[in-house]
């Protein structure tokens, strides 16, 4: 029985490379000369530091550009609020969302079941497994999910016959 998995994954190495590129660009740009602007990473949690709110927004824009150039979807970034650090410095927490959450998984399964396609969808941890009798029906399901869930980056893996 053909099946595929709906997942949401981010390549951690590509995120690391993008952060290195951001830090390199910030250190060489004239408008950041003498500032302490940088991006730090610990697993899937990023912290953006800068001297002012304006510089913080600029570093955030550079981060988005570099991530998209490296193939990481920027819809997976969850930006936090601006926090004051010592003196006049500011920081912002950015979380890289991975895995299909339970709410989104339930929404995907409900969307598939409401479409009346002849497939079965089941939630397995942070993935949604979809299986059906024919390949064509599975491809219709992929098109349906792409159309209905556009606010979160999803990948379709393990397409098996």
UniProtKB/Swiss-Prot annotation:
Xref: InterPro entries: DUF520, UPF0234-like_C, UPF0234_N, YajQ-like_sf
Keyword annotations of the record: Nucleotide-binding
Q: Does the keyword Flavoprotein apply?
A: no
Cross-referenced CDD domains, in alphabetical order?
A: YajQ_like
Q: Which Pfam families match?
A: DUF520
SUPFAM superfamilies (alphabetical): YajQ-like
Domain of life, source organism: Bacteria
Q: Which GO terms describe its molecular function?
A: nucleotide binding
One cellular component term from this protein's GO annotations in UniProt:
cytosol
Role, per record = Nucleotide-binding protein.
Q: Spell out the family assignment given in the record's similarity comment.
A: Belongs to the YajQ family.
The name this protein goes by in its record: Nucleotide-binding protein Tbd_1846
**What organism does this protein naturally occur in?**
Thiobacillus denitrificans (strain ATCC 25259 / T1)
Q: What is the lineage of its organism?
A: Bacteria, Pseudomonadati, Pseudomonadota, Betaproteobacteria, Nitrosomonadales
